[in-house]
Amino acid sequence: MSEPLLRGLAAGDPPSATGPVTGSADKVADVLIVGGGLVGGTLACALAEKGVSVVVIDGEDPEALLAAGYDGRCSAIALACQRLLDTIGLWDLLGGESQPILDIRVVDGGSPLFLHYAQAEAQGPMGYMVENRLLRQAILTRLGRLPAATLLAPARMTALRRDLDGVSATLSDGQTVRARLVVGADGRRSQVRESAGIGIRTLGYGQTAIVLTVEHERSHRGCAVEHFLPAGPFAILPMPGNRSSLVWTERSDLVPGLLALPAEHFQAELERRFGDHLGWVRPVGPRFSYRLTLQAANRYVDHRLALVGDAAHGMHPVAGQGMNYGLRDVAVLAERLVAAQRLGLDPGAPALLAEYEALRRPDNLLMLAITDALVRLFSNDIAPVALARRLGIGAVERMGPLKRLFMRHAMGTLKLGPEPPRLMRGVPL
């Protein structure tokens, strides 16, 4: 018996039930991935490298995605996730265009107290900053070299059907794709998630992030700085050369006015928050903005269906972990799908999908709770809260073991509970 299914997506029709998946298909694969962004593309590379056949459907034109002005964002890649990217052959394709994060300073407004994570304590980089555009390029290059991978882009899915034996997607050009499992990697407004009737919980913060790249007079020396201001965090993230990526969080009602400011007035607002520790500073390229919310799917799996990345969980960037937790999903799901393929097992088996959800959902929910608490704690200037917060920062700075625990968690190398997935330990599948 078939599941409730998604039809007429382009026309905005509600999901409707269909009959069994029948007939021939233009493309046949083990796994269909809807969404070829950073998380979906990485999953495709991890699977195809080991001979699991994948078809990736993405609605964006690859050429547009690689344009310097597409979205302006960068990602902080934790050390464990860098190991994943390296193990599946993506890291070398960046051509050295990444910036090691050697130090992290957390500052609470104008307080003299701060938290400093030093390279010496981490015994190496804590992570890396990478332009999303360059990571997309690496993914596209890698997919093009893997015979088991097929990318259909730009392509729009108009129907998704699931039955006892598999899934079938129909595209706007009439092509059909048949697979044994569909993975929704299609972001916060996931069509795959909606097709399964999986609900979401959303929390708003009344905050919007302004994202831009700046160049500055002095070297950042690989140091990432996060200032917690009353309106939200102001993060200065090191990029190659004398450049940094800014994630400037403001009240949403103020952002349109800031974005509309003439260059010299915007520069003044920027300098007021940035400070002079890197000498002069000036914007390079356009300004972008993104509304900040928390979003959590009520479940991650359904019949022959799994969700990864933002389709399953979307978090505030206060801790810089959104991309990393999507890659954790990739590591866990890829390990199980590759193992199933080697044993001749069904990649859409309920037990496999249940194990994926059991391993990932609690971890993601914990990080969602942590980021939510951080936003509410550090965006609160009520005197007793501010005092407790500053004392807490000072105390953690003086407590070496606790500070190192927080540092290892941010790096993705903290070992609590089950052993981390193979890819995050740098072990091939």
Curated annotation (Swiss-Prot):
Regarding protein family, the annotation reads: Belongs to the UbiH/COQ6 family.
Species assigned in the record: Rhodospirillum rubrum (strain ATCC 11170 / ATH 1.1.1 / DSM 467 / LMG 4362 / NCIMB 8255 / S1)
Can you name this protein? Ubiquinone hydroxylase UbiL
What's the domain of life for this entry? Bacteria
Q: Does the keyword Ion transport apply?
A: no
GN (gene name): ubiL
- Give the enzyme's main class according to its UniProt record, as a single word: oxidoreductase
**Endpoints of the signal sequence:** none
Alphabetized PANTHER family for the sequence: UBIQUINONE BIOSYNTHESIS MONOOXYGENASE COQ6, MITOCHONDRIAL
- Give a short account of what the protein does: Catalyzes the hydroxylation of two positions of the aromatic ring during ubiquinone biosynthesis.
Q: What Gene Ontology biological process does one annotation of this record name?
A: ubiquinone biosynthetic process
- What reaction(s) does this enzyme catalyze? a 2-(all-trans-polyprenyl)phenol + NADPH + O2 + H(+) = a 3-(all-trans-polyprenyl)benzene-1,2-diol + NADP(+) + H2O
**Keywords for this entry?**
FAD, Flavoprotein, Monooxygenase, Oxidoreductase, Ubiquinone biosynthesis
Q: Which SUPFAM superfamilies match?
A: FAD/NAD(P)-binding domain (SSF51905)
Region described as Disordered: spans on this chain = 1-22
Q: What is its EC number?
A: 1.14.13.-, 1.14.13.240
Cofactor names from the entry are:
FAD
Q: Which GO terms describe its molecular function?
A: FAD binding; monooxygenase activity; oxidoreductase activity, acting on paired donors, with incorporation or reduction of molecular oxygen
